[in-house]
Amino acid sequence: MPQLSRYSDERVEELLTELASVLSKHKAPTDLSLMVLGNMVTNVINNSVAPAQRKTLARSFAEALQSSIRDDNAH
């Protein structure tokens, strides 16, 4: 079941496009891109979420990431 978001698809896509553009501009390979994005997620959680909620949010984020990964062969 899709999650409802308080943010519009347009706003999400705009941010995604900008982030992808920065990674492309720096010719970041997949491993570096994942490292940087992972560090960004960690930074957001550590600086914007109450300490008591961090582990729960990180677990939920990881589960959402796992559920969004496709099993097909597309690149």
From Swiss-Prot:
Belongs to the UPF0352 family. Transmembrane segments: none annotated. Pfam families: DUF1414 (PF07208). It comes from Cronobacter sakazakii (strain ATCC BAA-894). Coiled coil: none annotated. This is UPF0352 protein ESA_01049. The lineage of its organism: Bacteria, Pseudomonadati, Pseudomonadota, Gammaproteobacteria, Enterobacterales. SUPFAM superfamilies: YejL-like.
